[in-house]
From Swiss-Prot:
Sorted UniProt keywords: Cytoplasm, Lectin, Membrane, Repeat
GO cellular component, one term: membrane
Residue span of region Disordered: 1-22
UniProt topology in membrane: Peripheral membrane protein
Upper classification of the organism: Eukaryota, Amoebozoa, Evosea, Eumycetozoa, Dictyostelia
The protein's name: Calcium up-regulated protein C
InterPro entries according to UniProt: Ca_Up-reg_Membrane_Reg (IPR051780), Ricin_B-like_lectins (IPR035992), Ricin_B_lectin (IPR000772)
Recorded name of the encoding gene: cupC
């Protein structure tokens, strides 16, 4: 069964509109707010997929997709609302096109949602959703309105809506970019390369810092002992801790789940001091700008293309129709009497059309000069809007095509540096969406003011394509591809992304409402996160940053095919002769070398492409964020038990999600160890264990998330042969993955008898749609 959620946990409310659609494949997002106010007679509630009443703040669980035929899908599109077999409670199930109990009618006039299978109405029973005969109670009254989900899952800034006296934006910042827990979160001017200002809002309402895995926004100490005023801190990610869960309401306020009446604001004057304190307090009013925030990028195009279609003004008869057809013929030199059909055509000049329409005069055959003038002004407006919308997308397409124009050559050059055979059938984890998302992240982190325009268009195109793929039940997994097919895979996805942007542009150009809203964004100041104003953008700088980021993404895909990390725990000898291929922290020393030779390191020409371009050594050597190198454990020049390292294999679980995980490794009834895996980090099972005799030895691994939910189970096969390093693999048919997750291709590297290092295996885990 499903529940309703407190309205204080909701996000942006939109203008209420009649819900409708024009295509059987199209699904429009909406939210449903109950007019029932609960026992306190104050708090209304949202229809929610949450399993518990006070669970989360994310808008995704309160956003639904209405299809043309009356199905109500979850925001992911995986499940639909249905009436249970008992005919009372409402539940989420797989789509069954033949089931009428999955069809609903939303009556926005009378605020009712009726089930077509049994004729009953959506109702509330002790915060659970049910259906019941019409009874007139407030529990059966629902206000439905349009909205698009807030940007979750992508990195960006949280900026105050209030600018300083020099029109600079200020944003949430971790003090001094510290990765230590209980560090103050303050306000600083938004700056390039300030990783402490980059955050990610997760689907359950946590706000992750890009500084480190598991580092989240939390409530800090009380201000002068107050129960309603607190500072903000960072802290370690905790399970089911409402103080670490946040939401964004209709007033663009970031509120806390534990204290839903308290919101994030700041005390002080922006621009006077270099750092301003953030507070959690109750705003003096809904419009208090010190408590209002903007996500950067806003992905404003996502919201626009999810709007209810708004057709162009209709001219169906009389002088209005005659004026429209006459002006269409004049504009196009007799080509068509329907000029709107050409707004999406790439082979026409809308600028020439505009001049022709402007110079046209009312012919004697049209009696109403007022009708003619009204149509003429409307067409001029449409052409003005269309010209500017096309210009934005044309500039994006030009940027995007230049980025990938040397794709084949660049991939070949990198393959030669890494010593990869691009004709082989070796499988790599080559997710294109992750690669292009990393490009947009690089742009906004290097150019926070203006770079968000490119990210706005690009990420919106990605989302637009994914929604289209869901509607058409298409889109195979992109997490695994052979080297011989990698370029074709990347090129195909590049073309798909170009097509997605083109399709989104055409969707906007064919809808008066979408075109009007997009045009308005074209003239916002460039520093506005919602802006599409490309005037003054330094495309050369943007292209340089994007090219480096895409090159790095390609290295991330190719590097694990020939290199791995050799880890030596702290206190033991490790032969380091160059910082180019090594990294040391408090846990030990990490050395990058070939997978079959721990003494053969990557060439300087390759490492220069990393370190000279600002790539984090910590992220590379610990397989954090986009990096996924397998890790072998080795003890150099050791005797005794450590001389048998070649008999062992050490699994690494790479967590590509925003939820902390842990995995338990067992051998029969013996527990080898429990290992934590931070968000976007890798966890290495580095515990030394007894390997046994020659032959196959099996180790079971169970992966769960921080809330105790199962993620995946599999068995590692550690095969010992005489005078050889161990062979490691995932035992056939042992992998079980829970819904909502995808396990990528494991990287399996043999150990070495002669060099004394262990086998390594890395298992990447992704969140699926």
């Amino acid at each position: 069964m499903i529940n309703i959620e407190d309205i204080s946990k909701s996000s942006n409310q939109s203008e209420e509109k009649q819900l409708k659609s024009t295509s059987s494949k199209t699904k429009y997002p909406f939210a449903a707010k109950s007019l029932f106010k609960g026992s306190n007679n104050i708090t209304p509630y949202y229809l929610s997929t949450s399993n518990t009443f006070q669970c989360v703040a994310s808008e995704s669980i309160q956003t639904w997709l209405l299809s043309d035929d009356g199905h109500i899908f979850t925001s992911s599109g995986n499940f639909v609302l249905d009436v249970s077999s008992g005919g009372y409670f409402v539940e989420l199930v797989q789509l069954n096109s033949n089931s009428k109990t999955q069809i609903w009618t939303i009556d926005t006039t009378n605020n009712k949602i009726q089930n077509q299978g049994n004729g009953k109405y959506l109702d509330i029973d002790n915060l659970n959703i049910c259906v019941a005969p019409l009874n007139g109670n407030a529990t059966q009254k629902w206000t439905t309105f349009r909205r698009a989900p807030i940007p979750t899952g992508n990195w960006g800034y949280f900026q105050s809506k209030k600018l300083d006296s020099n029109n600079n934006y200020w944003g949430l910042s971790v003090l001094n970019n510290s990765t230590s827990y209980n560090t103050s979160v303050v306000m600083n001017k938004v700056q390039a390369k300030s990783i402490g200002q980059i955050w990610q809002m997760t689907n359950d309402g946590h706000i992750l810092s890009r500084l480190d895995g598991n580092l989240v926004l939390d409530i800090g100490p009380s201000i002068n002992g107050s129960k309603t005023n607190y500072y903000l801190n960072t802290n370690v990610y905790k399970a089911n801790d409402l103080m670490q869960q946040w939401g964004i309401n209709e007033n663009n306020q970031i509120f806390n789940q534990y204290y839903p009446n308290l919101c994030i604001g700041f005390v002080g004057e922006l621009g006077v001091d270099s750092t301003v304190n953030c507070v959690l307090a109750q705003p003096t009013s809904a419009g208090n700008i010190n408590f209002q925030w903007i996500a950067n990028p806003t992905y404003s195009l996502n919201q626009i293309v999810s709007e209810v279609p708004e057709p162009f003004p209709a001219y169906t008869s009389g002088d209005l129709l005659a004026s429209y057809q006459y002006l269409s013929n004049i504009a196009t030199n007799g080509y068509t009497d329907d000029i709107r059909s050409l707004y999406t055509s790439i082979n026409v000049s809308l600028e020439i059309f505009y001049v022709n329409v402007t110079n046209a005069t009312c012919p004697s055959s049209i009696h109403s000069t007022e009708d003619f003038s009204n149509v003429q002004n409307q067409i001029k407006n449409e052409l003005t809007y269309a010209i500017n919308v096309r210009l934005v997308f044309d500039n994006y397409s030009d940027f995007y095509s230049k980025l990938f124009s040397q794709g084949s050559t660049n991939l070949t050059n990198l393959a030669n540096l890494i010593n990869v055979d691009m004709s082989s059938d070796q499988v790599v984890n080559g997710d294109y969406t992750d690669a292009i998302t990393s490009v947009f992240y690089a742009i906004i982190s290097e150019i926070p003011i203006g770079g968000s325009i490119i990210a706005n268009i690009g990420e919106s195109a990605v989302e637009f394509g994914e929604l289209d793929a869901e509607s058409n039940d298409s889109g195979p997994s992109t997490y695994q591809v052979t080297l011989s097919k990698l370029y074709d895979h990347l090129n195909e996805n590049y073309e798909n992304e170009m097509a997605n942007a083109q399709s989104m542009k055409n969707t906007i150009l064919q809808d008066w409402g979408m075109m009007s809203k997009t045009f308005a964004l074209c003239f916002l100041p460039t520093n506005n996160p919602s802006s599409l104003n490309i005037n003054g953008l330094d495309f050369q700088k943007i292209s340089t940053i994007a090219s480096i980021a895409y090159q790095t993404a390609m290295i991330q895909m190719l590097l694990p095919t020939n290199y791995q990390i050799y880890f030596t725990p702290a206190g033991y000898y490790a032969p380091v002769s160059s910082d180019d291929y090594s990294y040391t922290d408090s846990t030990g020393t990490y050395i990058m070398a070939e997978i079959d030779n721990c003494n053969s390191h990557p060439p300087k020409a390759l490492t220069d492409k990393l370190w000279n371009n600002g790539v984090s050594k910590q992220e590379v050597f610990t397989s954090s964020y986009g990096w996924n190198l397998a890790t072998s454990v080795t003890y150099y020049n050791m005797v005794g038990k450590y001389s048998g390292m070649f008999k062992l294999s050490f699994p690494t679980v790479k967590n590509f999600t925003s939820v902390p995980m842990q995995f338990v490794m067992t051998n029969g009834s013996d527990r080898v160890g429990t290992f934590n895996v931070k968000t976007h980090f890798a966890g290495l099972a580095s515990t030394y264990y007894y390997s046994g005799a020659l032959g196959h030895h099996y180790y079971d691994i169970a992966v769960i998330d921080i809330n105790g939910n199962k993620v995946a189970n599999f068995t590692v096969d550690n095969n010992l042969e005489a005078l050889e390093g161990s062979y490691v693999s995932i035992k056939t048919n042992s992998l079980v993955v829970q819904p909502g997750y995808v396990v990528g291709n494991p990287t399996c590297n043999q150990g070495s008898f002669s060099q004394g290092f262990a086998a390594s295996i890395l298992i990447p885990i992704y969140k699926s749609n």
